[in-house]
């Protein structure tokens, strides 16, 4: 396109000025370049924004996974603490049981030793009354010792009861911790399921957005290639049309010059024919006069022969008559010679005029042949012009097909928006049902809602991009219409065939205007529908 603009500028500088068609074409090419560059930068910015959004989503998923790992670690630590408490309680119960067993054994030993002492004392009391006081003091000592052991036994029993209460409290605490662990495990399993479902939905949405981004990039590339192809095709058509118009103008000028030359040659031919006819008339008159003179010469010859036969005796009157006849004969011979010379001159002039007439006739035939060839070439140029018209019509049909594809893409976007609104509604219901679970889950769901709204905004931006593509196609249609108008303004009909071609081109222009008006109406209807859909979506939000 830039090469075409440079070629047009060079041609304009070489010619000293740019025509209106070339200036308008240059302006249109600049506008197309600006539009393509603007759309390319806009699409690159939106692609970068979508990529950053996907990166943020992946980072959030990583943070959720790290939080889930932390909660798993906390649950493992709680399990370890519960197991340690159970081990400690079991060890304490075993120690308490061993101590009680030892106390029971010591108590049994003391009871047996007390019984033995009682028996021994009874035997000694019966056998020996002397040591009664010593035995009594010994008995009191043993009784005090027994009381001490009984007190210790009571203390140990109290301590055993305290230990048993501690064991029961530890058992209740263990049960409470086990129940709490089960509740936490259930909550973690529920949260894990929710996180897995959210992760799956997020992955599916990421895949969907990635595929949509790829499709959008493919559509952008295809649209850019199509725009470049159409632009190149329009440039080629404009260049060929301009060259054809220039050739047509040159050939029409040559045709006019040939017609003028042919008319001049025909006029010269008519003049030569008139001169030839006059010369032929003169020759005919000279021939008639020659015949008359020849008859007179014959008459004088016969008269001279008669006079030679007559006798020589003549009268003076006859001699005078004879001399007069001789003078008449000389004058007749002179006229006859003059007539011969004039006849020869006229014959040479006639020969020259016939040669010039033949050359003029050959020139006329050659010019007529060239004129027929130029008419045929003009017809071929008209056929090429019709082909260019058909090509422009095909380009319009392609633009219409592009609009239809954009409308189908718009319908797909509408379906996607309705699906997203349903998902948002379902997520609102889910958020309302699971609102009292925990603040962390509520924050995550709010983040999901924000992400869904961001996706809705992205869809709205995609709709805006489709609208801008429609405007760009409309600009392309206007450019094609302006190019056709420029072609019609640049055409200079100079012959009846050129006027017929001009009328045909004007009819084709009116038909193309009608098609473009219908196309603009269709684009406006699509625009209203897209705006209505966006308003409905914003109202649902």
From Swiss-Prot:
Keyword annotations: Acetylation, Cell cycle, Cell division, Coiled coil, Cytoplasm, Cytoskeleton, DNA damage, Mitosis, Phosphoprotein, Ubl conjugation
Post-translational modification N-acetylmethionine, affected residues: 1
Regions of compositional bias (Basic and acidic residues) in chain numbering: 307-321
Residue ranges the record marks as coiled coil: 22-199, 242-305, 346-485, 514-541
Family annotation (Pfam families): CEP63
Top-rank taxon, per record: Eukaryota
Gene3D superfamilies listed in its UniProt record: 1.20.5.340
A Gene Ontology cellular-component term: centrosome
Keyword Cell cycle: yes
PTM per Swiss-Prot/TrEMBL: Polyubiquitinated via 'Lys-48'-linked ubiquitin, leading to its degradation. Deubiquitinated by USP36, promoting its stabilization.
Annotated positions of the Phosphoserine modification: 278
Subcellular compartments: Cytoplasm, Cytoskeleton, Microtubule organizing center, Centrosome; Cytoplasm, Cytoskeleton, Microtubule organizing center, Centrosome, Centriole; Cytoplasm, Cytoskeleton, Microtubule organizing center, Centrosome, Centriolar satellite
Span list, region Disordered: 294-324
Function: Required for normal spindle assembly. Plays a key role in mother-centriole-dependent centriole duplication; the function seems also to involve CEP152, CDK5RAP2 and WDR62 through a stepwise assembled complex at the centrosome that recruits CDK2 required for centriole duplication. Reported to be required for centrosomal recruitment of CEP152; however, this function has been questioned. Also recruits CDK1 to centrosomes. Plays a role in DNA damage response.
Entry protein name: Centrosomal protein of 63 kDa
Originating species: Pongo abelii (Sumatran orangutan)
């Amino acid at each position: 396109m830039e090469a075409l603009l440079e070629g047009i500028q060079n041609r304009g500088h070489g010619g000293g000025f740019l025509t209106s068609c070339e200036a308008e074409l240059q302006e249109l090419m600049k506008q197309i370049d600006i539009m393509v560059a603007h759309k390319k930068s806009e699409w690159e910015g939106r692609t970068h924004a979508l990529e950053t959004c996907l990166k943020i989503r992946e980072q959030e998923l990583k943070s959720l996974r790290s939080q889930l790992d932390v909660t798993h670690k906390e649950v493992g630590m709680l399990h370890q603490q519960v197991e340690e408490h159970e081990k400690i309680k079991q060890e304490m119960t075993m120690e308490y049981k061993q101590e009680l067993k030892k106390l029971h054994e010591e108590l049994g030993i003391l009871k047996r030793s007390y019984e033995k002492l009682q028996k021994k004392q009874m035997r000694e009391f019966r056998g020996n009354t002397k040591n009664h006081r010593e035995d009594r003091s010994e008995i009191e000592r043993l009784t005090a010792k027994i009381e001490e052991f009984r007190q210790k036994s009571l203390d140990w029993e109290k301590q055993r009861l305290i230990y048993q209460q501690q064991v029961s409290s530890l058992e209740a605490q263990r049960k409470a911790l086990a129940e709490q662990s089960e509740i936490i495990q259930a909550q973690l399993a529920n949260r894990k399921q929710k996180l897995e479902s959210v992760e799956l939905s997020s992955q599916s949405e990421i895949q969907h957005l990635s595929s949509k981004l790829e499709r959008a990039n493919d559509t952008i590339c295809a649209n850019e290639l199509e725009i470049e192809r159409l632009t190149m095709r329009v440039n080629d058509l404009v260049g060929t049309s301009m060259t054809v118009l220039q050739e047509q103008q040159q050939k029409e000028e040559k045709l006019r010059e040939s017609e003028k030359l042919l008319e001049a040659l025909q006029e010269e031919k008519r003049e030569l024919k008139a001169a030839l006819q006059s010369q032929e008339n003169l020759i005919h008159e000279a021939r008639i006069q020659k015949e008359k003179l020849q008859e007179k010469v014959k008459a004088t010859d016969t008269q001279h022969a008669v006079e030679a036969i007559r006798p020589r005796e003549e009268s003076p009157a006859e001699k005078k008559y004879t001399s007069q006849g001789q003078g008449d004969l000389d004058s007749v011979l002179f006229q006859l010679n003059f007539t011969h010379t004039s006849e020869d001159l006229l014959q040479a002039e006639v020969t020259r005029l016939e040669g010039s007439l033949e050359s003029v006739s050959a020139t006329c035939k050659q010019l007529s042949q060239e004129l027929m060839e130029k008419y045929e070439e003009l017809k071929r140029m008209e056929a090429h012009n019709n082909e260019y018209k058909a090509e422009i019509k095909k380009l319009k049909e392609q633009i219409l097909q592009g609009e239809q594809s954009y409308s189908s893409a718009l319908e797909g976007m509408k379906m996607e928006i309705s699906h997203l609104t349903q998902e948002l509604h379902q997520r609102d219901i889910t958020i309302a049902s699971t609102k009292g679970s925990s603040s962390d889950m509520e924050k995550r769901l709010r983040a999901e809602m924000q992400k869904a709204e961001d996706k809705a905004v992205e869809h709205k931006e995609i709709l805006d991009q489709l609208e801008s593509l429609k405007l760009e196609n409309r600009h392309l249609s206007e450019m094609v219409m302006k190019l056709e108008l420029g072609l019609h303004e640049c055409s200079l009909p100079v012959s009846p065939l050129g006027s017929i071609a001009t009328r045909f081109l004007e009819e084709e222009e009116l038909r193309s205007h009608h098609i473009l008006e219908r196309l603009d109406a269709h684009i406006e209807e699509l625009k209203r529908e897209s705006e209505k859909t966006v308003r409905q979506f914003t109202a649902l939000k």
